[in-house]
Regions:
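Charged, low-complexity intrinsically disordered regions
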Residues: 2-221, 286
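ASCE P-loop NTPase motor core, strongest for the SF2 helicase catalytic module
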Residues: 219-288
Length: 288
């Protein structure tokens, strides 16, 4: 760029302050790589902010990065804006255990043997020793049935399965055959609905749990900001002077020039033909 403009490097960096950003590199602080603001202030903002804050301990020039990223950060969602379903894998198993023990009033002795675990390899939840808490009315009547106690139903809920109850008979060849018991299945699935409703009412009640889960949800799923391309700097030499491109058209052309893979999902009449034609001419002119 210095050879093209005739300006020295430091002048260009100063003149482009806020338009370009030096990418912080904690492992190699001396490495210099610059990107445009629309690229830097997009993607996983929360992760970039962590790196920028660490980089300020080495070089205070990155404080501008911290300020810009803080402004670009998606606004945190509140608990009322987050829908949590029973079985969501981002929720810790100990929280599910706490819910299960509270609604079923599980005895202290049974708590030592009944546990909820999650396997990332099989993507399944497991409730161990489901039959250990025998005689618990809440597990066998309120939230369960005599054919499927609440611990089994909770396990099926966690795995997003509707519980099915089967009876077994032997056919003429002596083979054991499973026959769906529709009545018991319907009752079991109604109990599952009661468990799901209880979970929705329970999950946000405790203040500390609510704060922990909202923070975790925002960190996991609310950190990304889509890139917004800005085509205001594009000049389009030799374009017909009777054609004036609108703001969204210039931005779409910038997206084509820098994005490599673009879908122009505009409505009819938005000017897609001009966008594609102008982008093709610019790509050709720039030798891209």
């Amino acid at each position: 760029m210095s050879s093209l403009t005739g300006f020295d490097k430091e002048k260009m960096i100063n003149d482009l302050h806020g338009v370009i950003y030096k990418i912080p590199n904690v492992n190699e602080p001396s490495l210099e790589e610059y990107v445009t603001a629309d690229e830097y202030l997009s993607g996983n903002i929360r992760e970039k902010l962590k790196i920028a804050k660490i980089s300020t301990l080495i070089d205070l020039q990155y404080q501008d990065h911290v300020d810009a990223l803080t402004k670009a950060m998606p606004q945190d969602l509140s608990a009322s804006e987050i829908e949590v379903r029973l079985g969501a894998t981002w929720i810790d198993s100990d929280i599910y255990e706490q819910f299960m023990f509270e609604i079923l009033s599980t005895s202290g002795f049974a708590k030592q043997h009944i546990h909820i675990t999650y396997s990332k390899f099989t993507d399944t939840w497991n409730v161990s020793n489901k039959n250990w808490d025998r005689g618990n009315a809440k597990a066998e009547k309120t939230y369960g049935t005599h054919r499927a106690n609440a611990y089994r139903l909770i396990e099926d809920c966690l795995n997003l399965k509707g519980t099915k109850i089967f009876d077994y008979e032997y056919d003429d060849d002596g083979k054991k055959v499973a026959i769906l018991n529709k009545k018991e299945t319907m009752i079991a699935q109604q109990k599952q609905d009661s468990i799901k409703d209880a979970f929705k009412n329970w999950i946000w009640k405790d203040f500390d749990r609510r704060e922990h889960l909202t923070q975790k949800y925002n960190e996991l799923f609310n950190s990304t900001r889509p890139r917004e391309y800005n085509g205001d700097h594009l000049e389009f030499p030799n374009m017909n002077t009777e054609i004036t491109l609108r703001k969204h058209q210039k931005d779409a052309i910038a997206h084509i020039l820098y994005g490599n893979n673009v879908l122009l999902a505009h409505v009819v009449g938005a000017g897609k033909t001009y966008e594609m034609t102008a982008a093709c001419m610019e790509l050709k002119r720039l030798g891209i």
